[in-house]
Amino acid sequence: MLLGGINHVAVLTGDTERFTEFYGAVFDASSTAVQEQDGFKLTMVQVGPTAELNVFELAGNTEWQRQVPMFGRGRLDHLALEAESLVAFDEIRNRLLARDATDGFVTDFGPVLSLFFRGPDGLEAELCVANPDTTPGVVNPPGTPAIRYVTG
């Protein structure tokens, strides 16, 4: 493969400070303001060793408010972030639960565990991590509960 991963994803926000506070508090992400002038803000939010969110805030632009159902959002539907480890996944999940940013349901896709969440602007995103309980060759459909997170 000639690629090493995704470098960045550009997203729109209505409130850069709220956005960077959320990603900083939940994911320990750092941010750097790059440009701010004439109703235009660009901030880089580092979400991995080589990956970032390029966060744009434009005065008068309301596109960030459009949160339609999954598969109705245009060409890019959502982004998925990779947790560094299962321990990190659990810590992030707890932080998201504390902010009511997720229902906490973890999907077992086989090789990957997945948790959906919503950011401060309503942008739906996903947190993933390698599944330590995977059975080689088994891939599960969406909605398959991860046994390690089932209570009761």
Where do the PLM segments sit?
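Short beta->alpha connector loops
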Residues: 36-37, 60-61, 108-110
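Hydrophobic pocket/interface hotspot
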Residues: 19, 23, 79, 96
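Flexible, glycine-rich phosphate/dinucleotide-binding loops
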Residues: 38, 62, 133-136
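Vicinal oxygen chelate
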Residues: 2, 5-14, 46-47, 66-152
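A short, acidic/glycine-rich surface segment
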Residues: 40, 61-67, 103
